[in-house]
């Protein structure tokens, strides 16, 4: 498994049913909760502070999560982090989705059930409310999400949990 301690900082797997792709790299003070799934070529580095990844979260292919001293990272339950996302010392609320190729900087806080659209930049220290759509660089609130859109964000997370179980059972290297 691609898990590494650095000094006294080590990865902790809480609960069960984790999926960590063979080429992902997790280093340092990381807490990974039940049903969290970490996909191919993800790098999670926590040598400076703690990264907590909540139950049912998915970190999709090519994403990077890193923290600076004094800027821990927390992803609440059922957060979806899209492909090639860069998260740095931020907090993401329950059931939110961070779109492909987005960047969220130190001290930023994303509310619950919020959609950060693809290619969006959330600046350092920015606070985004619950249940909104954010687009652009810098990211701006465009509108509130409809209840069915927020439910769709949760379906993404639960779908990735199911997909991760399929991969755990069926993924085999070719020789």
Where are these regions (language model features)?
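Left-handed beta-helix
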Residues: 16, 21-22, 27-28, 33-34, ...
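C-terminal segments of enzyme domains that contribute to small-molecule binding surfaces
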Residues: 2-13, 73, 77-81, 85-86, ...
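A short, polar/charged loop-to-alpha-helix boundary motif
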Residues: 51
């Amino acid at each position: 498994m691609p898990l590494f301690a650095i000094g006294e900082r080590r990865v902790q797997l809480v609960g069960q049913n984790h999926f960590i792709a063979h080429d992902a790299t997790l280093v340092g003070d990381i807490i990974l909760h039940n049903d969290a799934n970490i996909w191919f070529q993800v790098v999670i580095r926590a040598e400076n502070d703690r990264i907590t990844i909540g139950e049912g979260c998915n970190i999709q292919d090519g994403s990077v999560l890193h923290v600076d001293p004094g800027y821990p990272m927390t992803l609440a339950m059922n957060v979806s982090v899209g492909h090639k996302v860069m998260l740095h010392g931020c907090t993401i609320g329950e059931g939110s989705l961070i779109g492909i190729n987005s960047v969220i900087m130190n001290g930023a806080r994303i509310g619950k059930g919020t959609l950060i659209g693809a290619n969006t930049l959330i600046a350092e220290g920015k606070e985004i409310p619950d249940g909104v759509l954010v687009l652009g660089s810098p990211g701006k609130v465009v509108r509130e999400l409809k209840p069915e859109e927020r439910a769709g964000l949760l379906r993404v997370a639960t779908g990735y949990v199911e997909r991760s179980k399929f991969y755990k059972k069926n993924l085999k290297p070719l020789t």
